[in-house]
Amino acid sequence: MALVFELMPNGSLENWLHESRNMSVGQRLDVGIDIALALDYLHNGCEPPIVHCDLKPSNVLLDEDMVAHVGDFGLAKVMFDISGEQSTTGQSSSYAVKGSIGYIPPEYGMGSKISPLGDVYSFGILLLEMITGMRPTNNLFTDGIGIHEYVMNLLPDNASDIIDSTSLRSDGTTDEKLECIVSMLEIGVACSVKILVKE
């Protein structure tokens, strides 16, 4: 048996955010929407629901039209309850939690069960990284201050100080673009709030 995948000639989002390539504000917005739609499908369109568990820039692939596709489902979990039936609580019976540092919810390290909320958290961190250009593992983030707290403390008044300058250079800054960027940052902050998923 062989698996055949669609060619993704534009590589991963990681390459566009942290190498020599530049993404415009519009492209970043489109990619964010594509990822949100993919997560909505996994969490609400699949039967049973699937939690990706490893959403990060290197697992987002871009096709020839710069449409984002979520890939690498090696850590994904199907949401079943202990009896083997689909979970109605949105929690899984699995305690084996893996993922990428900086993107995985801190609650998973405290024994919380896997939940779609974990993917929402990872999506929020990913949005913040897309707009700031800073990895969540940046050395700037110490003493309990992560990318979430960093952005939250600067919004909305100092948003222009935290925006990745390459996105603004590629297509210029306007009030409309800045408003769009601030909205994306606010969504990223809202999604990456630490929420304990109860047992």
Regions found by a protein language model. Name each.
Residues 1-33, 66, 70-199:
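Cytosolic eukaryotic protein kinase-like domains
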Residues 37-50:
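Protein kinase catalytic-loop region centered on the HRD/HxD motif
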Residues 48, 53, 68:
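Residue immediately N-terminal to the catalytic "proton-acceptor" Asp
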